[in-house]
Design a protein with these regions (language model features):
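Q-loop/switch helix immediately C-terminal to the Walker
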Residues: 93, 98-114
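Hydrophobic anchor residue at the start of the ABC signature
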Residues: 149, 188
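Conserved ABC ATPase "signature" region
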Residues: 117-132
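Conserved ABC ATPase signature
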Residues: 135-144
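Helix-to-loop junction immediately C-terminal to a conserved catalytic motif
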Residues: 57
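Conserved ABC transporter NBD signature motif
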Residues: 65-76, 81-83
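Catalytic Walker B motif of ABC-type/P-loop ATPase nucleotide-binding domains
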Residues: 160-164
Length: 227
């Protein structure tokens, strides 16, 4: 009787260190994510969360250690080409064209992916179905973020890298975000979130980034010290 080897993690950070502007952000991080896994990067503004996400996306290399996808180093040219096709990236820049309709702003990305038919249902799920034919310039900041989330659903890649996904969302929008993350994970998708705001993601691993700069003393701090 032969023993089965445990499955490789889909994504493995092996003793990874990350630097920005010659400053260490994280040192010797070890994380393994299997299908359906989630990682939350917590930290204040300026702590390096976006830099860390960009490293996971392959835009920069670790200062030490390695990032493995299916057991292969993502910095290798042939591997990176395959790896990047697995990624769905949501950044603080929404890339929404104001002159296009709301539907066009999702459909264009779906067509580039070689897919069709998912854009309108994605917008409807995000509560924007009635605005599909409106120009995107009419959208509020929260609605623009919902358009970005609709793109995630329409493109439907397995690994989501989400940079501050709840910023500009109201309470209902945050609940929708948490719902689509949970549904993506049920299908075996992986979610990595960088945030300074609370978000409910069941069984997620938490990685806390130390503040890059000491917090400035406020009037409340001074009064506390004086008391």
């Amino acid at each position: 009787m032969s023993l089965r080897r445990p499955p490789l993690p889909r994504l493995l950070l092996n003793n990874v260190s990350c630097m920005r502007n010659a400053q260490q952000i994280l040192r010797h991080v070890n994380v393994s994510l299997h299908d359906g896994g989630a990682l939350v990067l917590m930290g204040t503004n300026g702590s390096g969360k976006s830099t860390f996400l960009r490293m996971l996306a392959g835009f920069s290399k670790p200062s030490a250690g390695e990032i493995l996808w299916n057991g292969h180093d993502i910095t290798q040219a042939g591997i990176f080409h395959q790896y990047k096709l697995q990624l769905n990236w949501l950044s603080l820049k929404d890339a929404i064209k104001d002159k296009f309709t709301v539907l066009d702003n999702v459909q264009w990305f779906e067509v580039l992916e070689g897919k069709q038919g998912g854009s309108l249902p994605a917008l409807e799920l995000m509560g924007l179905g009635r605005l599909a034919k409106d120009k995107a310039r009419m959208l509020s900041m929260g609605q623009r973020k919902r358009v970005q989330l609709a793109r995630l659903l329409a493109i439907d890649r397995p690994i989501w890298l989400l940079d501050e996904p709840s910023v500009a969302l109201d309470g209902d929008g945050v609940k929708l975000l948490e719902y689509i993350i949970a549904e993506h994970r049920k299908k075996g998708g992986i979610v990595i979130v960088a945030t300074h705001l609370p978000i409910q993601i069941e069984d997620a691993m938490i990685l806390r980034l130390p503040p890059r700069f000491p917090r400035r003393m406020t009037l409340v701090d001074m009064l506390d010290r004086g008391g």
